[in-house]
Amino acid sequence: MLKKLALATALLAGVGTAHAYQAELNVGYENTDIDNVGDLDTFFINGKYYLNTVQVKNSPLAEAAFLNKASNIGLGYANASGDGDEDIDVFGVSGEFYIPNTQFYVSGTINQVDFAGDDNTGYALEVGYLPVTGLLLAVGAANESVDPVQVANYGFTANLSNALTVGDDTALSLRAKYVTQIGNHFTNFEGLTYIGDETTYRLAADLYIDPTLSVGLSIADSTADGSDTLFGIKAQKFFTPTIAAGVNYHTTDGIDSFGINGTFRF
């Protein structure tokens, strides 16, 4: 009897950890229509390897790594091509580390943009603190950074605009992320600003209808002369704990973009 009970307990424990994963791959495509210029097609692929297994608990699947404080290293690539002859290629290496037994966080990325025979290397560094569960506050520095992972998350237009707006000087970055439960639903709130020659900002919110399905809104702008507000909407659905698909749409004066993406966990 005791052996049967022990076996049943082990099987139940296995069910609880069956959705754990240690690697994630993201792929996607975005089409940007620019009035009087033409289309810009962007393809991206990026992956992360987590130093420890990420446990999927009773929380949104999309936020599992963040809520687990899962340190990781990553690689990313994005390609943007328009009606002209030249492509824009972006390569990046990144890392996020949650210091064990503390509430501190550090991250960094180094990336290279190749365009028309010119190579440009950028970087971004952050240090952060998590005062309560689900809340990250971070400050950092960035220089001409076009991160292919952020291209996947926020869109190519928004990320290139950030890099161009803050200029060649090193910019101060401020970022906050807060995942919490309000009523019966989890929510995610994010804010990001770069302060350089000019200041850019992005605010976003996601509502998790259930742990597998989310919808989100975003707004981005800058202090640059002639800057127009960029609005975004997105949705993501996990069909299984390891496979998800998402769609997004961004619009500003004279520019509209639509994207699709897929997430695969191993």
Predicted regions and their residues:
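Repeated loop/turn-to-beta-strand initiation elements of outer-membrane beta-barrel proteins
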Residues: 23-25, 54-57, 101-106, 133-139, ...
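Solvent-exposed loop segments that connect transmembrane elements
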Residues: 146-167
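Solvent-exposed loop/turn segments connecting transmembrane beta-strands
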Residues: 31-42, 78-91, 111-123, 143-147, ...
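Glycine- and aromatic-enriched membrane insertion/assembly motifs of diderm outer-membrane
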Residues: 40-62, 66-68, 93, 97-98, ...
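Cleavable N-terminal export/targeting peptides
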Residues: 1-24, 36-39, 55-59, 67-70
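Residue-level signature of outer-membrane beta-barrel architecture
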Residues: 31, 49, 97-99, 129-131, ...
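Outer-membrane beta-barrel "beta-signal"
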Residues: 40-54, 174, 237, 255-266
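Membrane-embedded beta-strands of outer-membrane beta-barrel proteins
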Residues: 25-27, 45-47, 93-95, 125-127, ...
